[in-house]
Amino acid sequence: MQGKIIKSLAGFYYVESEGQVYQTRARGNFRKRGETPYVGDIVDFSAEDNSEGYILAIHPRKNSLVRPPIVNIDQAVVIMSAKEPEFNSNLLDRFLILLEHKAIHPVVYISKMDLLDSPEEIKAIGRQYQAIGYDFVTSLEELLPLLADKITVFMGQTGVGKSTLLNRIAPELALEIGEISDSLGRGRHTTRAVSFYNTHGGKIADTPGFSSLDYDIANAEDLNEAFPELRRLSHECKFRSCTHTHEPKCAVKAALETGELWPVRYEHYLQFLSEIENRRETYKKVIKRK
């Protein structure tokens, strides 16, 4: 039999197959090979009615995220608050390059719009992201249709209202709502283990996790690929390995001068590139010491 792991709890894996859910365990040979089944895995398994089954094989994964681990994701809703905490395009772009690198479709959702005196600034920013090709929504009514036929996870800085949003999408989840700490301006972690939940024609992960940014982009080429607008323009650069910093006849810098490219995104690209290069230099120094 073949199915999808929709929940993992205390060593048991709950596999959905043809409308039924089976409780299974992983055979010991997975541990010997250093393999662990995760929520989202497509697996082959054996199970009889009303009895414990066993996972026999894990199919190749198209992508994965960590903390909590979840695999084979179709899209991720990146939740950014308009206020408390303040909207941060640099942080948003960090989430976006993580998702681009993992081949996960991003959807940007702006929470707490009601706290703004005027929504125009956020809407103007939204138009810039939409021009790149991203879904950028500011209401639940805009978000819900995007969940159909997709496996969706939710990510965002602590305190942006991840639990609140999930409770609005599926009230039966009854996720604990975090509070904003007055002293820190940051939310407290109030999430739990991951599992899938059927809602609005798709599946969502019932955890507002993924507030950490563990992206493994290690070079300029990968970073370029993680910026869709740079990726499209870079085919017109004179040099194939153009980093869009100092090279002549760079299509990205030309687009910046003509106003075709949003300067904010280019500034973030340069900052992230500098961080990658600094990490590489630090790594080289550590290796030399050894």
Swiss-Prot record:
MF terms (GO), sorted A to Z: GTP binding; GTPase activity; metal ion binding; rRNA binding
Residue numbers binding Zn(2+): 237, 242, 244, 250
Cofactor: Zn(2+)
Enzyme Commission number(s) from the entry: 3.6.1.-
NCBIfam families for the chain: ribosome small subunit-dependent GTPase A
Function: One of several proteins that assist in the late maturation steps of the functional core of the 30S ribosomal subunit. Helps release RbfA from mature subunits. May play a role in the assembly of ribosomal proteins into the subunit. Circularly permuted GTPase that catalyzes slow GTP hydrolysis, GTPase activity is stimulated by the 30S ribosomal subunit.
Protein name as catalogued: Small ribosomal subunit biogenesis GTPase RsgA
Natural source organism: Streptococcus pyogenes serotype M1
